[in-house]
Amino acid sequence: MDTRTNGKPQRDANLEDVLERLKGGHILRYHTRPDCSDGQNVAAHTWRAMVILQTLWPDLSKNALLHLMYHDIAESRTGDIPATTKWDYDRLAVEVAKIEFKYNCELGVNFPVTDKEKDCCDIADKLELVFHCQRMYLRGNYLAGDIIVNGRDYLDHKYRGRPHYDIAKNVLIELLDNDLNPSE
């Protein structure tokens, strides 16, 4: 019996933990905007966001990667509530955050990160949204344009002036600097 983690035997009892954690990856994104989904689920989004995080900030801690890896896992309990809905309904956002925190604690996936790491994870998360929707846009799905603009504006308003945002800002400028920029 392997007892390397918390003295808990590594047998069938852990299968439930694995399955519960994997369940979050099956949640479909953009359910309120299915025209922009392209079938993307949380697992695909998270992998892409982690690639962005590790590429732009390769020296961040393992906890930062784990924080991002599990950032949407609670959606298997709450559903994927759009960020714009949470922005419009502050009390809802607070209650959902409580549910997500409790669920993450139950699963043991709350990883301590610095404020900078938390920012970088959020930036990578939103950059992935912009990359995904820009890909849709460039394939002729102009319905994704407003999501691109909202994502770009969110990042610029929230992180402008913070040194760790500069690299992401440059990526956004390069990504959106073409004749098909949805803000034009």
What is each model feature region?
Residues 1-184:
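Alpha-helical, largely C-terminal catalytic domains
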